[in-house]
């Protein structure tokens, strides 16, 4: 009988990262997915990254994950979002050629050390004494294992809706999984329904682009991965159009036919990625909504109209599309649809992503209530790392709110749960100025090296970058001019007769990297390696970063204050019954987690700390 250390069920964005991370740590790993085409499949929009999401991709890359490198092999339209705003909210994004992305992912995984891939369907999980033992395939064969990672996406009791039509499916033309859903229910997991949707696909050859606005990408694509020196994929343009009052009228007239508004769907959809029906109802005063026409590939005429996700009947979809400028004569290749699926309350998992009920069972991706490729991949890499570390009886790997967006996401999910699809935003992070896309490797790669999940190749690249940063910093502290000379160049500085280094100049609000290069031309050769930009940001926001680091230190001290598993909150007399019940239900593991629970007062936190000091003065936390 076959036996593996770790089995990953599902080959989507969470699954591939989980499998690869587990394999990198030396665990014998099996990835089970329905068919080869599912590896890295982009079920919805053909793009990676965006605001906050781009930072997640960079963090995955920092831990030697796949997503950043793979998009660099298939990215056809790179754009830094929010670049006119502060660096804390910059969002690297790349449009993908679906075929190139999947091809690159498949090539990497099929040659990955310690990783086998099985194309088949898992029907059930064998559990004994609250611990995983094996997976059971739909042909009744059994594969033994120590750990299982479930990355089922929208396949758990998946149901597609197009108008009044219902189609049991995990994705178009793919069967859902009922066996796994039933098993999770039997075990006692809290299961609910969520919904997501996708727009119709249209034929780019039938679009009148003269009625649309051009959306060019960045002149020079900035790679996602530290392993990529330059993006060699041809770059293309996207286009923008918009809905009209006629579009809105058609949608309003047919709302009763929408699966969303007829009461047919019980699952809650993503708040920040609403269907076009939702937009018309929720933002009724808006006369138009933008639609981004995104090509799905270099040699593919399919266009993804980002912004009109819908579950209206096919005939209504055809009507509303014809009212959009440039799409009057467009051919619809595939209708849009909504899909409803099961998910598990993420408070059922710990920060390692292992379930609390079943030892050795991990969840990652949409099963935890998230939406988005990047959110799924971020969970996948953490689940894969922790499953492999557990096999080797090593300490778990936990990211926190203080060092990563991945940590913020996992903390949000495991502390608060979610009743709607969770999407990452910069606003969710209290330390976003410190947790930027440009410094993800400096925050996380060394942590990855310490546990052995980072390859030698990446380790060498990272070590050299750190050395180059120190050399560049030294140079920027050496290059200087007098204040009088700077004034003659039109740079406003206090005339105190001192010398100002480049790092000093970077702190001037109106001063930028381009000016520094103009004054010191030798800096131009450093412009392309991103180090100059990194040091510019660090200098520009030095005072803010210093304050934020103090906040982070306070946060970390509270995270280090463990709360014993056997604590009885009802024995702490100075806190209310409501708070005692809330703490008993949430079971926070640290003072930091307890503080973040809604309704827990500062006075209650103080009472807990005092109680711990008196009751557990010996340092016991069992």
UniProtKB/Swiss-Prot annotation:
Domain of life assignment: Bacteria
Cofactor: FAD
Amino-acid positions noted as binding FAD in the UniProt annotation, renumbered to this chain: 10-15, 122, 177, 366
Keyword DNA-binding attributed: no
InterPro entries: FAD/NAD-bd_sf, GIDA_C_N, MnmG, MnmG-rel, MnmG-rel_CS, MnmG_C, MnmG_C_subdom, MnmG_C_subdom_sf
Main location (coarse class): cytoplasm
Assembly with partners or alone: Homodimer. Heterotetramer of two MnmE and two MnmG subunits.
Matching PANTHER family: GLUCOSE INHIBITED DIVISION PROTEIN A, PROTEIN MTO1 HOMOLOG, MITOCHONDRIAL
Organism classification: Bacteria, Pseudomonadati, Pseudomonadota, Alphaproteobacteria, Rickettsiales
SUPFAM superfamilies reported in the protein's UniProt record: FAD/NAD(P)-binding domain
A GO MF term: flavin adenine dinucleotide binding
Alphabetized UniProt keyword annotations: Cytoplasm, FAD, Flavoprotein, NAD, tRNA processing
Gene3D superfamilies attached to this UniProt entry: FAD/NAD(P)-binding domain, GidA associated domain, C-terminal subdomain
UniProt GO cellular component terms: cytosol
Biological-process GO terms, alphabetical: tRNA methylation; tRNA wobble uridine modification
UniProt-annotated location(s): Cytoplasm
HAMAP family, sorted: MnmG_GidA (MF_00129)
Protein name as it appears in the record: tRNA uridine 5-carboxymethylaminomethyl modification enzyme MnmG
Keyword NAD: yes
Residue numbers binding NAD(+): 269-283
Job description of the protein: NAD-binding protein involved in the addition of a carboxymethylaminomethyl (cmnm) group at the wobble position (U34) of certain tRNAs, forming tRNA-cmnm(5)s(2)U34.
The family this protein is said to belong to: Belongs to the MnmG family.
């Amino acid at each position: 009988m076959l036996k593996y250390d770790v089995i990953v069920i599902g080959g989507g964005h969470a699954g591939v990262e989980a499998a690869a991370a587990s394999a990198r740590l030396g665990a014998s790993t099996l990835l089970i997915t329905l068919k080869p085409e599912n590896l890295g499949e982009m079920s919805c929009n053909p793009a990676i990254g965006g605001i906050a999401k781009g930072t997640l991709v960079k963090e995955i890359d920092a831990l030697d994950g796949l997503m950043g490198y793979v998009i660099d092999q298939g990215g056809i339209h790179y754009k830094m979002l929010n670049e006119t705003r502060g660096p804390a909210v910059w969002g690297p994004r790349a449009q993908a050629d679906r075929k190139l992305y999947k091809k690159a992912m498949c090539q990497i995984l099929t040659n990955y050390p310690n990783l086998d891939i099985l194309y088949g369907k898992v029907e059930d999980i064998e559990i004994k004494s609250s611990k995983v033992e094996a997976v059971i395939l739909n042909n009744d064969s059994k594969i033994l294992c120590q750990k299982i990672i479930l990355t089922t996406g929208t396949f758990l009791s998946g149901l597609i809706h197009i108008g009044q039509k219902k189609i049991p499916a995990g994705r178009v033309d793919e069967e859902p999984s009922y066996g796994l859903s039933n098993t999770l229910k039997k075990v006692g997991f809290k299961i609910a329904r969520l919904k997501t949707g996708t727009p119709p696909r249209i034929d780019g050859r039938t679009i009148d682009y003269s009625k649309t606005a051009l959306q060019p990408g960045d002149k020079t694509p900035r790679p996602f991965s530290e392993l990529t020196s330059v993006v060699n994929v041809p770059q293309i343009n996207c286009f923008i159009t918009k809905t009209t009052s006629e579009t809105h009228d058609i949608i309003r007239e047919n709302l009763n036919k929408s699966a969303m508004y007829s009461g047919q769907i019980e699952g809650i959809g993503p708040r920040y990625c609403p269907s076009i029906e939702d937009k018309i109802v929720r933002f009724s005063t808006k006369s138009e909504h933008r639609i981004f026409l995104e090509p799905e590939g270099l040699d593919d005429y399919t266009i993804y109209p980002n912004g009109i996700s819908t579950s209206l009947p096919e005939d209504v979809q055809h009507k509303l599309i014809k009212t959009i400028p440039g799409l009057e004569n467009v051919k619809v290749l595939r209708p849009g649809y909504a899909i409803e699926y099961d998910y598990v309350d993420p408070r059922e998992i710990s920060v390692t992503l292992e379930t609390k009920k079943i030892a050795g069972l991990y969840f990652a991706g949409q099963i935890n209530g998230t939406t988005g490729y990047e959110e799924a991949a971020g969970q996948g890499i953490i689940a894969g790392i922790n499953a492999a570390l557990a096999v080797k009886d090593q300490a778990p790997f936990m990211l926190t709110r203080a060092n990563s967006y991945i940590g913020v996401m996992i903390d949000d999910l495991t502390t608060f749960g979610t009743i709607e699809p969770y999407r990452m935003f910069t606003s969710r992070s209290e330390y976003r100025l410190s947790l930027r896309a440009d410094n993800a490797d400096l925050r996380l790669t060394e942590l990855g090296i310490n546990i052995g999940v980072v390859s030698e190749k990446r380790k060498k690249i990272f070590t050299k970058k750190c050395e180059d940063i120190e050399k560049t910093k030294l140079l920027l502290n050496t290059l200087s001019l007098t204040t009088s000379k700077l004034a003659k160049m039109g740079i406003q500085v206090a005339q105190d007769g001192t010398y100002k280094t480049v790092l000093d100049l970077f702190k001037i609000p109106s001063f930028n990297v381009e000016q520094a290069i103009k004054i010191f031309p030798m800096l131009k050769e450093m412009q392309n390696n991103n180090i100059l930009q990194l040091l510019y940001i660090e200098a520009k926001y030095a005072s803010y970063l210093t304050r934020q680091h103090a906040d982070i230190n306070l946060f970390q001290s509270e995270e280090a204050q463990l709360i014993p598993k056997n604590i009885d909150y009802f024995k702490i007399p100075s806190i209310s019954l409501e708070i005692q019940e809330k703490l008993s239900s949430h079971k926070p593991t640290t003072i930091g987690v307890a503080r973040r629970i809604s309704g827990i007062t500062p006075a209650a936190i103080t009472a807990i700390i005092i109680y711990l000091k008196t009751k557990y003065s010996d340092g016991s936390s069992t």
